[in-house]
Amino acid sequence: MSFKKSLKMGENLASESDLLSMISEYLKFGEFEETARTFEKEVKRKGKPALKSAGASRRDSKIISIYEDFLSSFNDGDYKVFSELWAKNIPPEIRDFDPVAQKLEFYLQIHFTIYPLKSPLGSHDKAEFDSRITHFRHYLETRGAALSQTTEFLPFYALPFVPNPMVHPSFQELFQDSWMPDLRDRMEKFLTVTLKASNTPRLLALYNDAGKGNKEAIQQMQLQLTEAERKSAVHIRRFAKLQADHHNLIGVTAELVDSLEATVRGKMISPEYLQGVCVRLFSGNMRQSAAQSLDFTRPGTASSMLRASVAPQRPKDVPLLPSLDYEKLKKDLLTGSDRLKALLLQALRWRLTRSLHGEQRDTVLQAFISNDLLERYSNKQKTVLHLIKCKNEIVRQYTARLINAFASLCDGRLYLSQIPALLPFLLDCLKTEEKESVTRENVLAALQKLSLRRAQQSAMIRDGLIGWLVKELNDSDCLSDYTLEYAISLLMNLCLRTQGKKRCAEEAKYVLKVLTELLGHENHEIRYYVNGALYSILSVPEIREEAKQMSMEEILRCYNKEENPELNRQIEFIIKQLNSATIPEQEPESDDEEDEDDDDDEEDVMEADLDKEEVLQPQPKELSGESLLTTEYLGIMTNMMKTKRRSCPPSSRSIDEPLQRPVTPSSHKNTIAGGEGVYPVTRQRSEDSRFSSRPATRTGSRPSTAESIHQTLATDSDCWRSSVESGLMGSPERHVPAPGQTTNSVQSYSGHMVGFASRPKIPRTPDSDAGSAGRSRLPPLAPQFSNSEPQQSGSRPGSAGGSSGRPSQQSSQSNRK
């Protein structure tokens, strides 16, 4: 017998005795006595492990343990533990439909409600009693509603509204010494019958449980398949239309090229020909008759319609979602069952993620904030935020998803930053959750988005998050792409701060080792953040020296031969930083500056991954989502809309240079997507442009900047020239002003700009004179370029482009252009 085969048999022997015992147990259960006796004899004859007769006894011992837990929680008045035991161990067909079980449950609810009043005189816990009264009232409105027409229970529906039940004549019986023992006896008899009723053999139980799980999984997959087919049909229709438009556009373009060639040869284009081309061009977007009735020969008509067809339109007549009773919502989030908590957290998140971008979503968010959904201003010992520490995994996950949704929006981040306990909770959760859990992914994403705010950056650095991130990234093969992207982008954000660089300098060799290994990771999306982190920390002389000892330049040269020219140019910048001989002047400490310098000025982006892989699926006829909120929690005038702070428009960006402001993956992806020639590099924005849709990506918004790197490079004129000249395709010899100078000559930027997406800091309140020109007309079709380089000043580490004072009027005006 081979070693491999014997090893396999040895592994099987460990469970063989259990399997044989289960077969014997099932034969006896089915009254196959003769077969069972023959089976046992053959087991002995073949020398198999002795059959265990502990199947029933093990089951009995488990029942006894459950029975004792019921009694213990009853005697201690622990209604939460008792409720979990009741829901888990009493079969649904008995719990929901058996009259005896329903009546017993009603009296048990009364017992747990008045339990605090039965404590020794003078030690009554009024707050605990109020909490239990709220729970009892919820029970009366839900499961207890079925007994509301029963005379026996009718008086108890007034219990929540009686100030002192102990002295009320209707409830005197409840406080007699005999009432509680009698109820316990009834409960014991019920449990004895109910728990013993399940005498199913383990083999049959395994079969039934497996079938039940498969059935539920099949139902869930069928729902997902139906939804996927619906989305697929929609996308197929859209694709067909886009394909037809594309083919039409190619044909029109070919004709226009022919016309241009004919014009060059001196042949004139007739108005009828132009009219025909324009009718074909617009036939897909309007009725044929309408297209033919327009006079496209009039100068400007066709071009105006083309610009109008791509101009973002503000949504019109978007209905606001109904107001909610937030007080009732918050109570049920604290006192309801775990399933109700999860359903409410899911519904609240969906209200935020599935609302339309613009006024509808702004109103939802402001309603959450103004009604203090996460109980920022509550003095209670336990708040909604504590659900992140709930024992139930789904509740924890859905709390993290909701916090992540808040963090995806600028005002949401502002609200979260005002909750002192939030950051410690998230950091604790990050370090205790399992690596691949969805909860940890959402907590990490929320922290990454909060790192756009300076106060949160400082707190994360103080709490040692940099060390934890580096340790996690050292084992990057065990991380999902989602976790990897957020972890490295969060690390980069923290490394932009002075204190963050100092933390990295404490373990410079280890940090550099981890970052250089990530340069070769198969996920190229993370390269931008790795390069940004390297560029930032290499500004510290101690880290530069350590990098030189590690032969960092040779390592970087190995990664400078890839097909991606943007990443290659970034590597060149890092090498220049590594070889910089100039010791930078003492940088001002940035960690204690005011929040007005937060890098949190991007448009809101609600990522699609917030609603991915929903583990909670509603049961048949169970309310969920918006229907749950509007059916059970309808309120009056709780939607308080206020003017939303406008985010600053994207400004001129050089994408060849390292990221120098805190970023999040989605906005960076939006930035580099624009570098492929799809969008102008810089452009003016109309008032309505804030309503334009943006692609849903992995995360929330992320700012980035180029000005601060220019300011850093200003100390080295060679690096300054390289930073401006590199990557501007077709214009390597254009005049570049020296640092600190400005020029009125127009710089012609040709080609596309991609790579280290970064942009200058823009004041939150732009100068009215400087901004008036940009708001006076709609965005032009052609790109508009800055008339001057940004004015250089002393770089403040981590704030990306801000100086000790505000940028000059000329600089901010050119940035907005």
From Swiss-Prot:
Protein function: Involved in ciliogenesis. It is required for appropriate acetylation and polyglutamylation of ciliary microtubules, and regulation of cilium length. Acts as a positive regulator of hedgehog (Hh) signaling.
Predominant cellular place of this UniProt entry's protein: cytoplasm
Domain LisH, first and last residues per copy: 15-47
Annotated localization: Cytoplasm, Cytoskeleton, Cilium basal body; Cell projection, Cilium; Cytoplasm, Cytoskeleton, Microtubule organizing center, Centrosome, Centriole
InterPro entries: ARM-like, ARM-type_fold, ARMC9, ARMC9_ARM_dom, ARMC9_CTLH-like_dom, ARMC9_LisH, LisH
Region: Disordered, residue numbers: 580-605, 610-629, 642-817
Comp. bias intervals (Low complexity): 805-817
SMART domains: LisH
Organ and tissue specificity: Expressed in multiple CNS regions, including the cerebellum, all periventricular regions, and all layers of the retina.
Name of the protein in question: LisH domain-containing protein ARMC9
Result of knocking out the encoding gene: Embryos with CRISPR-induced armc9 null mutations show curved body shape, retinal dystrophy, coloboma, reduced cilia number in ventricles, and shortened cilia in photoreceptor outer segments.
One annotated GO biological process: positive regulation of smoothened signaling pathway
Disulfide linkage: none
A GO CC term attached to the entry: ciliary tip
Polar residues: compositionally biased ranges: 692-715, 740-750
Bias (Acidic residues): 586-605
Xref: PANTHER family: LISH DOMAIN-CONTAINING PROTEIN ARMC9
Name of the encoding gene: armc9
Keyword annotations: Cell projection, Cilium biogenesis/degradation, Cytoplasm, Cytoskeleton
